[in-house]
């Protein structure tokens, strides 16, 4: 199944591609993002961390049909990546995301989460979505 671009009022959720690693590497390695991620994310974040994750984890899992990754972008600035949202077909953690701090507090992740959740239930026809998150990570 080809992963589609999802659109919302303000956002484009574009399927992750290898070229996104450059922008991810610029935005992601910040403690205010990484501290809320799973414990397997290394800190300090390595210089090739995004390239390694995109090419060796995310894209292969997308090809296997067990994950759906999107870069989050504003429709008005479609070349600028703001964060990532993903869905995983695993038992206890089906949705993950991060957003660069300068874009937080503006409702972007809520908008992206609604679109991804809709895709999970209405396109993939999954009966349940589990998304355990850090309670302190809220705005």
Where are these regions (language model features)?
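Short loop/turn motifs at secondary-structure junctions and domain boundaries
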Residues: 60-66
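Short, P/G- and charge-enriched loop/turn segments at secondary-structure junctions
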Residues: 1-2, 56-60
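Acyl-donor (CoA/ACP) binding surface of acyl/acetyltransferases
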Residues: 1-36, 69-139
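A generic alpha-helix propensity feature with a strong bias for hydrophobic helices
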Residues: 18, 45-47, 63, 104
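Conserved GNAT-fold acetyl-CoA-binding loop/helix
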Residues: 34-56, 68-70
């Amino acid at each position: 199944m080809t992963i589609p671009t999802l659109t919302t009022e303000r956002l484009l959720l574009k399927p992750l591609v290898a070229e996104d690693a450059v922008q991810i590497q610029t935005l992601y390695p910040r403690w205010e993002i990484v501290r809320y991620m799973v414990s397997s994310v290394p800190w300090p974040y390595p210089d090739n961390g995004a390239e390694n994750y995109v090419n060796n984890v995310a894209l292969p899992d997308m090809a296997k049909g067990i994950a759906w990754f999107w870069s989050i972008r504003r429709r008005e600035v479609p070349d600028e990546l703001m964060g990532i949202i993903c869905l995983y077909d695993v038992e206890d953690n089906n949705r993950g995301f991060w957003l660069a701090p300068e874009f937080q507090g503006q409702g972007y992740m809520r908008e992206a989460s609604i679109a991804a959740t809709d895709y999970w239930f209405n396109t993939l026809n999954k009966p349940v979505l589990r998304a355990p998150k850090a309670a302190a990570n809220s705005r």
